[in-house]
Structure formats: C-alpha cells, structure tokens
Amino acid sequence: MSLDFLPFSRPSIGEDEIAAVEQVLRSGWITTGPKNQELEQRFAERLGCRHAVALSSATGALHVTLLALGIGPGDEVITPSLTWVSTANVITLLGATPVFVDVDRDTLMCSAQAVEAAIGPRTRAIVPVHYAGSTLDLEGLRTVAGRHGIALVEDAAHAVGSEYRGRPVGSRGTAIFSFHAIKNLTCAEGAMFVSDDSALAERVRRLKFHGLGVDAYDRLSHGRKPQAEVIEPGFKYNLADLNAALALVQLKRLDALNARRQALAERYLERLAGLPLAPLGLPAHKQRHAWHLFILRIDAEVCGLGRDAFMEALKARGIGSGIHFIASHLHHYYRQRQPRLSLPNSEWNSARLCSIPLFPDMRDDDIERVARAIEEILEKRR
C-alpha cells in the first residue's frame, strides 16, 4: 500500500481561517478595507514598529520601496545572489544595476564586510536577506549603511517571527515580509512593509495604490469625494480584505505555528545527525530562528549522488522537496550580462541545496518517514 505524497510545504489552514474569509465574503466589502487596516495595526503592534503597510506581494513591496527611495537608472543596489530572483528583477526593471555579493558558505547570508567591499560611488541601497528563518548580522549591516549614507531594506520574506538579539525582525529600520502560501504566516499571496521612516512609509502607501492619497475604503468610510487625485503615478499592489482576514488569524497563531516548526526542525537535527548532509550553520549572535525552511546540502562526493538525483529519489518515495535557491547571477539573463562574475559560496550551494518537508501540520511520523527515506537513499550509494 503506497503512502500519501508528503509535500515539501503545505499551509496550515483551519476552521478559524475559513470562518474569517467567509465573514468577509458575507460583509459586502471584499477588497482593501477594514480587515486590511486591522492587519496593519496588529502587525505593527506585534513588532513594535512605527508603520506597517500591507501589499499584494513582497515583490510589489520591494518595487515600490526602491522606487520610493528614488532608485533608478544609473544606480546600484547591493544584494546577495543567493535569493529569489525577484529582487534582481525589480532592481533591473527600475533601470538600476544589481550588484551581487557572495554569502557565507554555511549560514547562506551576506556579511557586512562583503557588502562594504561592494559599495561604490553609485550604490544607493542594500537589500540583504534573512535566510530560511535565521537572521542577518543587522548591527554590522546598519553600521555599514550608516557610514556610507545608504538605505538598508531587509528582505524578511523568510523571517516572520524571527528575532535578532531579543527583538523581532522588523522592529527597527525598514523590512519587507512575505505572506506567500509556503511562508510561516500565509494569506495565499501578500506582504507587509514595515518601517520607522514616516516619509518613506507614506510614499510606499501612496505608490501601492495608483499614487492616490487614499484607498477605496477611505473614500467610502470617510465620505471623501468619489474621485481622489493622483499625487504621483503609482501601481496596483493593494491587499484585499479576503487575504487580510486570513492573515489576521494566522498572525494570532504565529507563535504556535513557529513553535511547531521548531520542534519538527529539532527532531530532524536529532534524527539526521551523523549523516553527510551538511545542514546550515547558525550565526554567532543571539537569535530566535523561525524555521521557515529545513535545508540540506547534497554533495555527490560525500553522499554518493548529486542533489537532483537525491530529489528524484525522494519523489520516488512520495516525498517532495525544493531548491532555495539557484543563485540569481546563474540565471540566463544575468549570466549574459555578468559572464565573469564568480561567487564561489553561492555557486557551491546552488548546486547542492535541498529543502525537505517542514510545515506545522506535519506529524512526528512524517519526520521519521523522511529520515528513513534519506537513510535508505544514502545507504544504497555507499
């Protein structure tokens, strides 16, 4: 009898989420409205930040954030190559140039030293990435950004619920969180921009909704004139209340969801100890890991098979997996433009990274199933 397929990730959706979405559907107001405003307020309260702006995706949030910072043609933005390629795409579409830096071989995050070495006369912003639920050396990066007068925008897509030195990621400075379907807090598609910069937050809020000073619900609830004026050209990146209602329930559950992720990750670490799988290293600073991903590095020289063959072997046993990520500079478009760029740690990891199943609704038996499958795969190659 075959086992059900175990995906690499699956959202944890319960009756409370379903009821919250149903309530919005029955309310008569399903687009951006009161649930959106409540989500922004609750998120800001949780982090202790000054401003929170909900958007339809982290990609859209980064787009309007960099635009609000004045990033454009001739500018350079420093970012690690080992991240989802949307970061490089947004920078490029603004007419700027992504300056890719390498990451630490084991934490897969960029250092303040690597970033500072890449700063040039055209550098306007730094977009470092909190990776897999672990956290960046923020103090070092803030020092570098401050010394050079360069904007720092944290990519916190993996870090909702993470803490850096006792404070939530996003509680200080500017950061962008993702609420995509596989994230620790999901609303299917969505994001949150947070900042203590009032002028930047105001412009992001304006740019995410056509460049208007108000949204549709403001005009309805506050009796403003039906056609607001465009202050500057903007985009359509607002989050609907259907999504916001789902996110609100998930926000209430976040601590419990992340605690379950941690318990599962600890079980993996215990169960897979001693196997030649090279799990990620942790930074030296104090942190709370959100365990967005559980990542192995599959090196053919020590495992007896490469990453792609390993993933196929898992699939044959009914187990899903993922790759996070193929380094951005290795994608065809960017390789054509920077053919000589060499980032050894990013490239080594790109060829070996494998994310194995990790999501709150997994059972302890699922961890055992994955561990036994991995042991079997490796044993056959010895």
From Swiss-Prot:
InterPro entries: ArnB_NH2Trfase, DegT/StrS_aminotransferase, PyrdxlP-dep_Trfase, PyrdxlP-dep_Trfase_major, PyrdxlP-dep_Trfase_small
Catalytic activity line of the entry: UDP-4-amino-4-deoxy-beta-L-arabinose + 2-oxoglutarate = UDP-beta-L-threo-pentopyranos-4-ulose + L-glutamate
GO CC field: membrane
Pfam families: DegT_DnrJ_EryC1 (PF01041)
Entry keyword set: Aminotransferase, Antibiotic resistance, Lipid A biosynthesis, Lipid biosynthesis, Lipid metabolism, Lipopolysaccharide biosynthesis, Pyridoxal phosphate, Transferase
Modified residues (N6-(pyridoxal phosphate)lysine): K183
Enzyme Commission number, as recorded: 2.6.1.87
CDD domains: AHBA_syn (cd00616)
Pathway(s) per entry: Nucleotide-sugar biosynthesis; UDP-4-deoxy-4-formamido-beta-L-arabinose biosynthesis; UDP-4-deoxy-4-formamido-beta-L-arabinose from UDP-alpha-D-glucuronate: step 2/3; Bacterial outer membrane biogenesis; lipopolysaccharide biosynthesis
Record-level Gene Ontology MF annotations: pyridoxal phosphate binding; transaminase activity; UDP-4-amino-4-deoxy-L-arabinose aminotransferase
Keyword hit for Lipid metabolism: yes
Family of this protein: Belongs to the DegT/DnrJ/EryC1 family. ArnB subfamily.
Subunit structure: Homodimer.
PANTHER family recorded: DTDP-4-AMINO-4,6-DIDEOXYGALACTOSE TRANSAMINASE, TRANSAMINASE
Protein name (database record): UDP-4-amino-4-deoxy-L-arabinose--oxoglutarate aminotransferase
Species the sequence originates in: Pseudomonas aeruginosa (strain ATCC 15692 / DSM 22644 / CIP 104116 / JCM 14847 / LMG 12228 / 1C / PRS 101 / PAO1)
